[in-house]
């Protein structure tokens, strides 16, 4: 830092500071579930093109829930997703992680209850430790983990209903295990389905210490339900927002889209407006039939709404504020000292160098030998002299 300079005159009072532009609110990242494998990654750029170059900052995939070896992250499965995530710092990888194997095999409530209690006792810790280690090795330690999603329903083996207390203990154990892996920065997303379903999702909430995001899967169902009813129903969209705010958590919508009410443009318009208003950390549309709008051609009206709203969307930039003019203290303008006009130095006209007239080479007569008398003598004589060979001839 330079030394301070003592002013030579009293300092001018500081002018009022122009207000800085209001910082933009954090952008709500969005994307879509396009496929669970490499095709899902490849389609992100194509969907972006369809949306006029909109920035899709979220990639979303699911680990298979058939067996524990796949829940650990099978070799090669996550590599292409990790590659995409690492290409830009502002991207996000969202990974749905089942809490049980045989996750969609209609396991009975009694068996689910037994499995939840085993998990709560630590029987499955090693599988989640292995997954965390794999994600850290792939250099995606900040992956969003949507763990045990839609736990308030009846679809999955990792459902909460058969034993909510064991379920919450098991969730906490999984999170603690994954957080114990060095280098991790995971964010855990608690994402029930909208509405009461089989059990109120608030009964499954495992506590603020092990939840980073409060998500919600919100499809346009059941049939005949208006969007206002989806907002205001018990455990609906409004209660979700209020619950997250009360617990100091950001919200998300890992799954959403059309469903029981078909090609419902009104739902699409209202859901997009809802997310613009409440600014989730991220949202990912489920883009396959009957839910989607790009890969599913049976929803043209909703597709047009989705595309028109998100076309060309990028992160917001700060809005310029009206500049406040800064008062300027007038400073007297000094009178400049006249500077004499310089007189140009005359440039002499160059004298052309005379080119001497070429002197024709004299023709030496026959029977004659030139005499070398030197250049100066030859100059005054007008050339070389020649002595004839026959000057002594007898006939002369």
Regions found by a protein language model. Give the residues of each.
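Alpha-helical scaffolding within the catalytic cores
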Residues: 39-48, 73-83, 128-131, 194-206, ...
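Substrate-binding cleft of extracellular glycoside hydrolase catalytic domains
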Residues: 70-186
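Substrate-binding cleft of secreted/luminal carbohydrate-active enzymes
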Residues: 22-40, 249-327, 364-396
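Aromatic-lined carbohydrate-recognition surfaces of secreted/lumenal glycan-active proteins
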Residues: 148, 175-200, 248-262, 285-288
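Hydrophobic faces of well-ordered beta-strands that scaffold small-molecule active sites
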Residues: 30-32, 57-61, 91-97, 143-147, ...
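Composition-driven, intrinsically disordered low-complexity tracts enriched in small residues
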Residues: 1-19, 321-396
């Amino acid at each position: 830092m330079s030394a301070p300079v003592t002013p030579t005159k009293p300092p001018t009072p500081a002018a009022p500071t122009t207000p800085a532009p209001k910082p933009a609110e954090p952008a709500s990242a969005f994307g879509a579930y396009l496929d669970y494998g490499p095709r899902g990654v490849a389609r992100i750029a194509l969907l972006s093109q369809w949306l006029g170059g909109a920035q899709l900052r979220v990639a979303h995939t699911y680990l298979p829930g058939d067996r524990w070896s796949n829940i650990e992250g099978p070799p090669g499965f996550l590599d292409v997703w990790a590659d995409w995530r690492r290409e830009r710092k502002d991207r996000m990888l969202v990974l749905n992680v089942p809490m049980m194997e045989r996750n969609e095999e209609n396991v009975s409530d009694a068996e689910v209850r037994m499995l939840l209690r085993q998990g709560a006792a630590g029987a499955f810790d090693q599988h989640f430790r292995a997954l965390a280690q794999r994600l850290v090795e792939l250099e995606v330690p900040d992956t969003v983990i949507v763990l045990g999603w839609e736990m308030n329903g009846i679809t999955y083996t990792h459902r909460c209903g058969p034993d909510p207390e064991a379920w919450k203990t098991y969730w906490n154990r999984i999170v603690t295990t994954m957080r114990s892996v060095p280098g991790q920065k995971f964010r855990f997303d608690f994402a029930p389905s909208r509405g009461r379903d089989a059990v109120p999702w608030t009964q499954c909430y495992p506590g603020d210490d092990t939840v980073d995001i409060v998500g919600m899967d919100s499809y346009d169902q059941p049939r005949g339900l208006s969007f206002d009813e989806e907002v205001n129903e018990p455990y609906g969209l409004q209660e979700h927002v209020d619950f997250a705010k009360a617990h100091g958590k950001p919200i998300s919508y890992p799954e959403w889209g059309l469903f029981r009410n078909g090609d419902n443009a009104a739902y699409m318009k209202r859901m997009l407006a809802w997310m613009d208003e409440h600014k989730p950390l991220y949202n990912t549309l489920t883009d396959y039939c009957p839910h989607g709008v790009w890969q599913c051609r049976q929803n043209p009206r909703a597709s047009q709404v989705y595309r028109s709203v998100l076309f060309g969307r990028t992160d917001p930039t700060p809005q310029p504020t009206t500049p406040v003019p800064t008062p300027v203290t007038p400073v007297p303008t000094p009178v400049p000292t006249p500077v004499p006009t310089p007189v140009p130095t005359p440039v002499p006209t160059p004298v052309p160098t005379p080119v001497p007239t070429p002197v024709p080479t004299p023709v030496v007569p026959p029977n004659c030998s030139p005499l070398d008398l030197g250049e100066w003598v030859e100059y005054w004589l007008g050339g070389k002299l020649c002595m004839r060979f026959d000057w002594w001839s007898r006939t002369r």
